[in-house]
Every structure is written in structure tokens, then in C-alpha cells.
Regions:
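Extended beta-strand/beta-hairpin segments
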Residues: 1-88, 99-305, 316-400
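Alpha-helical metal-binding/catalytic segments enriched in His/Glu/Asp
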Residues: 90-94, 310-311
């Protein structure tokens, strides 16, 4: 049964929209180190409901996104889950690079559809502090109609995968960096690696000042499309509250299907196979500087929001499972990506810098418990595991 109020539904706001007054709320992207840098603010709204505000240095756009969990975490299922955002951003980025390489080679692609599966693991006991989140290799199927022979097509697709900026998170074995505030005072870290520099100011009271820009699309950017079809996943789960069990040995599978519409919008159906849940349709488009019109969030925005959402969920799980006090919690995350090797014209593989996350906790627990909240949340976060694990995307090609 859902816990807490359904704030996302009560707000009457779209789940995703462009913020037109970023200067008023004070969000600015970090310095642009290697191509694009994004600052992501996230706050908890109600148990597992969260909202993010993401600002990009390259595009100049600021987006608000929202996330929720389904019955497996006693959520309201009002918005797509945190892991879906990385899958959506990743498959959108792959489509960007494939189409850019095809354009460079003057290749006509008559039809294309991408099908992606992301897999994660959760093993151990929360009470024993042995629970660890993991990430497994990604599977990508490209359904395509074009005139390239098999060898040339395979080479193009592998080059596109490597050219994606997310390649830097997958292949870099990046250890994330952190800073921690408890009740408005910075405290020393436990096991986590520290950020060099000062703790950022807490965006505590700045979220409520944003204003939504009217959409240029005659449809929601995010909307539910029904229950995900069931498929057998070894170690998969579907029961209510299953993600809150103390002892776990489970496999998660988030899928995505991406098509490129005639209007230039990438339409992505997110599939929640395990834990089994609701499918959502999400739209993506690159900004004008990257060749699009910026009518929906770009790939880097979805990826950045996804990591921060997933990390925030682990705080919620930890304190709920151990009955700890955590009144409010927020993060400010900085992510740094290169331009795409094809879409950005670098001709190089995509790269990234380690994520830098500032954490703000309001709690009556001790400093040691606050440190443990951060350490366990990082330890159990699937997407921080994704960043520190060297993985390749497994490619399969289907001719249409």
C-alpha cells in the first residue's frame, strides 16, 4: 500500500517541463570542463517521490523532472522510476550517435528502432550492512533498414556506441566524489571519497520558486502507457514491498524502446520488467546547439537526473528499513560529459569525469549515522555502481 501523500498528483503540474526562470531560483550549471556540464538538484517530496531540476552549460536549458516508485517500494507509481531515466538517456544518446555517423557517411537509414535492456543486481542484508548494488552489461538491439553490408553496419554501430558520452561513465571505472551536510553543518565523510573544494549551499528553499514553460508539443513529455508485459528474469521480483526485504538476492531489468519520429522527437517506451511495474512513454530531443529544437529533455539531462534519483532512493530505503530519522534530504550533483564523438564532431570515444555530489540531511541521528546513510546509499546505488564498473554494451543487429 502506498506510503505518504501523493504530492506529484496533488501538484497538478506536468511530470516534466522546462523551467523558464532559473535565475530566480539560483541554479547555474558548473564550469564546462570537457563539453557539457550539468548541475542536478534533487529533493525528496514524499517517501519515494522526488523532483529534480537539471541545468546544462552547453544547452542553457533547465528542466524539471519527477520520479516515483511502484508497489515494490510501496510507492504511488505516479512517475517513472529512477533507473528508467538512465535507460532513456542512454538509448537516446545511442540514437544521436547512430544518426550523426550515418549523416557523416551519407548513409540513408530508411527505418530504425533501438531496443535496450539494462540489468542490475542487489545482494546482501541491509541490517548487516552487506547489501551491495551492482550493474551488469547492457544489451542493445538495433533493428535497421539500410544498404550497408553486415561488416560495415556493425562497425558503424560499434563506433556510435563508443562515441556516446555515456561511454565515459561505463568504461571509466569512475569513483564518485561526495560532500556531506547534517543539519546545515558540513561533517567529515566516512568511507566515501571527498570532493575537492567547498560544500555548496543547500538549495532547500529554492525549489518552490520555479515556473513552468508551456510545452511546444501537444502531448505530455512523460506519461504512463500501461503495465509492462511480463517476462522471465532469473532473480526478478514483482511482489509489493519486495525491494524493502532485509535479505536480497535479486536482478533488476529496465528496458527501453526508442523510435525516431518524423518531427525529430525520440519517443522512448520505458519497460519495467523487474521489479515488475508500469511502463511510461518519455520524449527526448537535443537542444538547438546540438541540432534539435529542445522541445524535450536531452540525453545528458535524463542520464544526470537518473543517477541522482537512484542515489536518493537508497537513502529512503535505508532509513525506512532501519527505522532511522531523516526528515528531509536533498542532493546537488555535478556531472561532466564530453561531446559525442559523432554528434559533437570530436571523432573520439565519449568520456566523462567522476560525479560530484553534495548531500544535505536533516536528521536527529548522530554524525556517525549520517555518514553511514551516505556510505550505504552509495554502496547500494545501482547507478553509482554503473559508474565504477567497466562494462561494454552487447550489440545485436536485426535487419528490417
Amino acid at each position: 500500500m502506498p506510503i505518504g501523500p501523493n504530492i506529484l498528483a496533488q501538484s497538478k503540474l506536468p511530470l516534466t517541463f522546462e523551467v523558464i526562470n532559473p535565475g530566480d531560483i539560483g541554479i547555474e550549471p558548473p564550469e564546462n570542463r570537457i563539453g557539457d556540464s550539468l548541475r542536478t538538484w534533487v529533493r525528496s517530496l514524499s517517501v519515494f517521490q522526488k523532483e529534480a531540476i537539471v541545468a546544462s552549460s552547453r544547452t542553457g536549458l533547465v528542466w524539471r523532472l519527477a520520479s516515483d516508485e511502484g508497489p515494490y517500494l510501496d510507492g504511488h507509481d505516479e512517475a517513472s522510476c529512477p533507473l528508467s531515466f538512465l535507460t532513456v538517456g542512454m538509448i537516446a544518446s545511442y540514437m544521436n550517435e547512430i544518426m550523426a555517423l550515418a549523416k557523416q557517411q551519407e548513409l540513408v537509414i530508411r527505418q530504425i528502432r533501438l531496443i535496450q535492456d539494462n540489468y542490475y543486481t542487489m545482494e546482501g542484508s541491509m541490517r548487516k550492512r552487506t547489501m551491495v548494488g551492482g550493474a551488469l552489461p547492457v544489451e542493445l538491439t538495433v533493428e535497421i533498414d539500410c544498404d550497408l553490408d553486415d561488416a560495415a553496419l556493425n562497425a558503424l554501430l560499434l563506433n556510435a556506441i563508443a562515441a556516446s558520452p555515456i561511454n565515459g561513465l561505463m568504461r571509466g571505472k569512475l569513483e564518485s566524489l561526495f560532500a556531506l551536510s547534517k543539519n546545515s553543518c558540513q561533517i567529515e565523510l566516512g568511507k566515501s571519497k571527498p570532493i575537492e573544494g567547498l560544500l555548496y549551499g543547500d538549495p532547500e528553499n529554492k525549489f518552490d520558486g520555479y515556473e513552468a514553460k508551456g510545452s511546444a508539443l501537444n502531448e505530455p513529455i512523460v506519461e504512463p502507457v500501461g503495465v509492462t508485459p511480463k517476462k522471465e528474469i532469473p532473480g526478478g521480483t514483482s511482489a509489493a514491498g519486495s525491494s524493502l526485504a532485509d535479505e536480497q538476492s535479486r536482478t533488476l531489468n529496465i528496458g527501453g524502446i526508442c523510435t525516431l519520429r518524423e518531427d525529430g522527437i525520440k519517443e522512448i517506451t520505458q519497460l519495467q520488467y523487474s521489479p515488475h511495474g508500469t511502463s511510461f512513454k518519455l520524449l527526448s530531443e537535443e537542444a538547438e546547439v546540438n541540432g534539435g529544437q529542445g522541445r524535450a529533455p536531452d540525453a545528458n539531462t535524463y542520464i544526470s537526473a537518473g543517477v541522482a534519483f537512484c542515489f536518493m532512493t537508497q537513502f529512503g530505503r535505508f532509513v525506512k528499513m532501519l527505522d532511522l530519522d531523516l526528515k528531509e534530504y536533498r542532493v546537488v550533483q555535478d556531472s561532466y560529459f564530453s561531446l559525442g564523438g559523432a554528434s559533437g564532431g570530436t571523432g573520439q570515444a565519449g568520456t566523462a569525469h567522476p560525479l560530484e555530489t553534495h548531500v544535505y540531511l536533516e536528521t536527529n541521528e548522530s554524525d556517525d549515522v549520517a555518514r553511514e546513510m551516505l556510505d550505504i546509499s552509495e554502496q547500494t546505488c545501482f547507478l553509482h555502481a554503473f559508474c565504477r564498473t567497466d562494462m561494454k554494451t552487447k550489440l545485436r543487429v536485426v535487419r528490417l
